[in-house]
Amino acid sequence: AQVYPFVTLAKKDKDLRQMLVGAINRQTACILIDPYANGFNEGPTGSEWESDRTEMKKELHERKWEIDSLCYPIRLAYHYWKEVGDTSVFDSKWEQAMEAVYRTFREQQRKDSLGPYRFSRVTDRQGDTLLNDGWGSPVNPVGLIVSSFRPSDDATLFGFLVPSNLFAI
């Protein structure tokens, strides 16, 4: 989201294009590490949140599932392509990442099961953890995507975060 405003300037600035390609490629790599994560390290360095009850990996800083974390990379890549005409970012890794995005969105519609994502944290802040043994509040599967956390990193009480679902379409 932070570099998105620069996209309109990229056509005239080679260094800016290179920076945007790097950001898109980094976001692609992050999605491939874990599409449910919202914060990543530069490498496998671990995190202060390693004790969270979820599938943490050393490359992750935090694993709070938000729909927006998968929408912003798509928006950036799409508008970069529309502005510059460069398709180099749409390689096989990008394709794999988009398959992971699609799979994650389908899993979090929770039509067949709760999906693989759970999260709980030992904390005195209710907004930092999910209810129901890490699954979040129950939902009736209607086709919307469950977002366990809001873009502000606080837990959703009602999993169908409508603005984020609109962003996803």
Question: Where are the regions that the model predicts?
Answer:
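Aromatic-rich carbohydrate-recognition surfaces in CAZymes
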Residues: 3-20, 24-123
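Solvent-exposed, flexible loop/coil residues
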Residues: 13, 93, 149, 153, ...
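Detector for Asparagine
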Residues: 25, 38-41, 132, 140, ...
